[in-house]
Curated annotation (Swiss-Prot):
Gene name tied to this protein: Nfkb1
UniProt keyword annotation of Iron-sulfur present: no
Protein name: Nuclear factor NF-kappa-B p105 subunit
Domain Death: start-end pairs: 803-890
Changes after translation: Generation of the NF-kappa-B p50 (Nuclear factor NF-kappa-B p50 subunit) transcription factor takes place both cotranslationally and post-translationally via non-mutually exclusive mechanisms. A cotranslational processing allows the production of both p50 and p105 (Nuclear factor NF-kappa-B p105 subunit) from a single NFKB1 mRNA. While translation occurs, the particular unfolded structure after the GRR repeat region acts as a substrate for the proteasome, promoting degradation of the C-terminus.
PROSITE patterns: ANK_REP_REGION (PS50297), ANK_REPEAT (PS50088), REL_1 (PS01204), REL_2 (PS50254)
Site-annotated residues for Cleavage (when cotranslationally processed): G433, T434
Crosslink position(s): Glycyl lysine isopeptide (Lys-Gly) (interchain with G-Cter in SUMO2): K324
């Protein structure tokens, strides 16, 4: 506020020497102070006051219990502040005044009380022999905020009358008063005005929680009066023990001590008492070259709970491409004095870029064609052939080949049929060959399928022909008795023949499928005979349908869905892998819109959630896949899922805002998502999140299209305007104020602690008001906006609106055109034209105007619209009558000579009787990469000229609010 300094020039009093220096530029000590030589007398502080642990007391609390202790004071050894006049022996007078702790010291409004104290000043005599002066019973009286200006003005007046450092502590132009000594004198009107202005200015900046002691010694002159002033000395700062910024900073607990290098992860931190607008969370790392990296946690005053808990988001690490964890430190830091807490360790770990493990699965070794064949001879061919691991027709010594192990079907004498390797070259999925094992996730209706006669042995005895594929162990034959051996040989022979017949039937079935494929070229001929194997899962729990989607084989997905349609389809299309991902989840994650449509067509279930509780709507909104989200929202089951929270308590609309996806947000709003739904952690709505992320595009979309409740509250009563004010966002504060936000709504956070209340007398004890957006205003611009001052942004050359030729249309032509656009036909009215002209996002605002078509034309003119584009839009609508009206205007000379109507002449009905549109057309987010229609559409609003005129003003709010500020602003926000 230095620009408002009334002492910046001498014009106020029309004197050449008056007020030539600002009080902000006053030096700590005046250059005309005498007796400031190395050999002469000087004042020295022997014992500094104790900086922390002493409480400032209010008048109603009575005197302090014990005086201000010295810095070295201990429980059993008390000490107090002391000064000494050096190089001098004789009578002297020492005064003590309270001064501020800023760079430039000024008188403080608090008062010293105790023995030898009067009017807030302590006066003690020294000498004639002992030149050490102690102050054993000093107390500090805390003035209330309401009386700061009054007390400070009286204190400055007293200092000027007595000559107690007025040039140093009041204003440099009053330095000459010290020469008059301590005698009473009358102040001139000019001097009184200087004092009043100085008191007013210093009141705004005064910190009531900290003071310093200024010691000044006066030596007697030739007349015996104490007028010879020694150079004053100033003590260390003394902090009120009840003030938040007086306590020692300390981190008590954090719920996390590690986070990703990309930052943005939420952490809950418990601490000793802090001041919500004077605290930072600092991350730092000391580098080997001596440098220091630092980053600061992201939070606003609304994220500080009762001065003891902070919820913040971690900063991004200096290098997001690290390959191993990096150790840093985190600490609390006070903004005002840069005091820090003891640092705590924090670990940054590398970014997990493949949280869904899609890339990992894609990078696995792809199967080679040669891997499907063994190295031996015959049908078995060494481990990869049709009949398992045998090396040739009768081989029995080969080891099991790779691929899926097929169950034995109750034949213990034979190894499982080893199929060729799958896409992952794994042996998992169907359980490996063990006695009487079953399929993993085997379909319940598999026995009813066409393969039942192959998979189940017949009741009748089957005689096998040809040699047995497997032989009994010779070791067993040697040990068993002869009769037992014969019986066993018969059983084995029976089982050999039975198994061989079934294996040959299976081979014939696959051979026929291969012939059919050769004739038709349709891969579904091969897939059909293996359709029951689609339920097999690999070591990650993925089925063939999961893998086909992961590897982007869209046509294969369609083929699999076709051959498995029917009784086993539901089990396959909704099967989850080990990450609880269904094929539909993976199709959304891999951005395959066509596959999503195919899965939905065959009945994929939208309601299934992944391991984090995310539905497919959450996943699409998180990745910003608006096309896929649109496909999902068309499903009949989407309406039941659209407001479902995930494991973090976030709805899809919350995630769309957090992902900065305007298109997804618009789709969700249009589909009926609950705009005012609260996330389940703290009760924030989508509008709270948009303000928290400083995203005016999304905030405008929620207000204009979603009709969001502008004064919606969190669990602690915080509104979006609280957040905007606390973060100092002028644009969002102006937008919310224009939408009708109430700057006087109190949240549940006490404005102050009852013990620290500014004034107990005259107030109802125990009743503490909540905090309003006005109380939280981080700067004067936000404060003024909340008090009704119009928002005035600084425009750059890029902000200049384009110029069109719509103004060439005469008033009569525009009125005729507007009349044609007011017809109820949905294909030819103003709403359809707005969509064609790119202004459809403002249709909700247009409807609130008494003449929507006229408002539309005014907006189109402001946006730089052209007649050519207007005619083309009308042509697309097939509105020949409207086109003829425009063409006729240019055929009539009299009409073209008419003066065009201006936007300021247009009659616009206000949406609210008091709150203005507040330059919504100026609220462009120059840093945004997407356009909500709020950046460009707010530019296109024709409200800007009406804002500067005398006509009615447009606003977004529905409830009238009128707030103002009477008188000058005093005090610090």
């Amino acid at each position: 506020m230095a620009d408002d300094d009334p002492f910046g020039t001498g014009q106020m009093f029309h004197l050449n020497t008056a007020l030539t220096h600002s009080i902000f530029n006053a030096e700590l000590y005046s250059t005309d102070i005498p007796l400031s030589t190395a050999d002469g007398p000087y004042l020295q502080i022997l014992e500094q006051p104790k900086q922390r642990g002493f409480r400032f007391r209010y008048v109603c609390e009575g005197p302090s219990h014990g005086g201000l202790p010295g810095a070295s004071s201990e429980k059993n050894k008390k000490s107090y502040p002391q000064v000494k006049i050096c190089n001098y022996v004789g009578p002297a007078k020492v005064i003590v005044q309270l001064v501020t702790n800023g760079k430039n010291i000024h008188l403080h409004a608090h008062s010293l009380v105790g023995k030898h104290c009067e009017d807030g000043i302590c006066t003690v005599t020294a000498g004639p022999k002992d030149m050490v002066v102690g102050f054993a019973n000093l107390g500090i009286l805390h003035v209330t905020k309401k009386k700061v200006f009054e007390t400070l003005e009286a204190r400055m007046t007293e200092a000027c009358i007595r000559g107690y450092n007025p040039g140093l502590l009041v204003h440099s132009d009053l330095a000459y008063l010290q020469a008059e000594g301590g005698g009473d004198r009358q102040l001139t009107d000019r001097e009184k005005e200087i004092i009043r202005q100085a008191a007013l200015q210093q009141t705004k900046e005064m910190d009531l929680s900290v003071v310093r002691l200024m010691f000044t010694a006066f030596l007697p002159d030739s007349t015996g009066s104490f007028t010879r002033r020694l150079e004053p000395v100033v003590s260390d700062a003394i902090y009120d023990s009840k003030a938040p910024n007086a306590s020692n900073l300390k981190i008590v607990r954090m719920d996390r001590t590690a986070g990703c290098v990309t930052g943005g992860e939420e952490i809950y931190l418990l601490c000793d008492k802090v001041q919500k607008d004077d605290i930072q969370i600092r991350f730092y790392e000391e580098e080997e070259n001596g440098g220091v990296w630092e980053g600061f946690g992201d939070f606003s005053p609304t994220d500080v709970h009762r001065q003891f808990a902070i919820v913040f988001k971690t900063p991004k690490y200096k290098d997001v491409n690290i390959t191993k964890p990096a150790s840093v430190f985190v600490q609390l830091r006070r903004k005002s004095d840069l005091e820090t807490s003891e640092p705590k360790p924090f670990l940054y770990y590398p970014e997990i870029k493949d949280k869904e493990e899609v890339q990992r699965k894609r990078q696995k070794l792809m199967p080679n064609f040669s891997d499907s064949f063994g190295g031996g001879s015959g049908a078995g061919a060494g481990g990869g052939g049709m009949f398992g691991s045998g090396g040739g027709g009768g081989g029995s010594t080969g080891s099991p080949g790779p691929g899926y192990g097929f169950p034995h079907y109750g034949f213990p004498a034979y190894g499982g049929i080893a199929f060729h390797p799958g896409a992952t070259k794994s042996n998992t999925g169907i359980t490996h060959g063990t006695i009487n094992t079953k399929f993993k996730n085997e379909p319940r209706d598999c026995a009813k399928s066409d393969d039942r006669e192959i998979l189940n042995p017949p009741e009748k005895e089957t005689q096998g022909e040809g040699p047995s594929l497997f032989m009994a162990s010779t070791k067993t034959e040697a040990i068993a008795p002869a009769s037992t051996m014969e019986d066993k040989e018969e059983d084995v022979g029976f089982q050999d023949n039975l198994f061989l017949e079934k294996a040959l039937q299976l081979a014939k079935r696959h051979a026929n499928a291969l012939f059919d494929y050769a004739v038709t070229g349709d891969v579904k001929m091969l897939l059909a005979v293996q359709r029951h194997l689609t339920a097999v899962q690999d070591e990650n729990g993925d089925s063939v349908l999961h893998l086909a989607i992961i590897h982007l084989h869209a046509q294969l997905v369609r083929d699999l869905l076709e051959v498995t349609s029917g009784s086993i389809s539901d089990d396959i299309i909704n099967m989850r892998n080990d990450l609880y991902q269904t094929p539909l989840h993976l199709a959304v994650i891999t951005k395959q819109e066509d596959v999503v449509e195919d899965l939905l067509r065959v009945g994929a279930d939208l309601s299934l959630l992944d391991r984090w509780g995310n539905s497919v709507l959450h996943l699409a909104a998180k990745e910003g896949h608006d096309k896929i989200l649109g496909v999902l929202l068309k499903n009949s089951k989407a309406a039941l899922l659209i407001n479902h929270p995930n494991g973090e308590g976030l709805n899809a609309i919350h995630i769309a805002v957090m992902s900065n996806s305007l298109s997804c947000l618009q789709l969700l709003v249009a589909a009926g998502a609950e705009v005012n739904a609260q996330e389940q952690k703290s009760g924030r709505t989508a509008l709270h999140l948009a303000v928290e992320y400083d995203n005016i595009s999304l905030a405008g979309c929620l207000l204009l299209e979603g009709d969001a409740l502008v004064d919606s509250t969190t669990y602690d009563g915080t509104t979006p305007l609280h957040i905007a004010a606390g973060r100092g966002s002028t644009r969002l504060a102006a937008l919310l104020k224009a939408a009708g936000a109430d700057p006087l709504v109190e949240n549940f956070e006490p404005l102050y602690d009852l013990d620290d209340s500014w004034e107990k007398a005259g107030e109802d004890e125990g009743v503490v008001p909540g905090t309003t957006p006005l109380d939280m205003a981080a700067n004067w611009q936000v404060f003024d906006i909340l008090n009704g001052k119009p928002y005035e942004p600084v425009f750059t050359s890029d902000d200049i609106l384009p110029q069109g030729d719509i103004k060439q249309l005469t008033e009569d032509t525009r009125l005729q055109l507007c009349k044609l656009l007011e017809i109820p036909d949905p294909d030819k009215n103003w709403a359809t034209l707005a969509q064609k002209l790119g202004l459809g996002i403002l249709n909700n605002a247009f409807r609130l105007s008494p003449a929507p078509s006229k408002t539309l034309m005014d907006n189109y003119e402001v946006s730089g619209g052209t007649i050519k584009e207007l005619v083309e839009a009308l042509r697309q609508m097939g509105y020949t009558e409207a086109i003829e009206v425009i063409q006729a205007a240019f055929r009539t000379p009299e009409t073209t000579a008419s003066s065009p109507v201006t936007t300021a002449q247009a009659h616009l009905l206000p949406l609210s009787s008091s709150s203005t549109r507040q330059h919504i057309d100026e609220l462009r987010d120059n840093d945004s990469v997407c356009d909500s229609g709020v950046e460009t559409s707010f530019r296109k609003l024709s409200f800007s000229e009406s804002l500067t005129g005398d006509g009615p003003l447009l606003s977004l709010n529905k409830m009238p609010h009128n707030y103002g500020q009477d008188g000058p602003i005093e005090g610090k926000i």
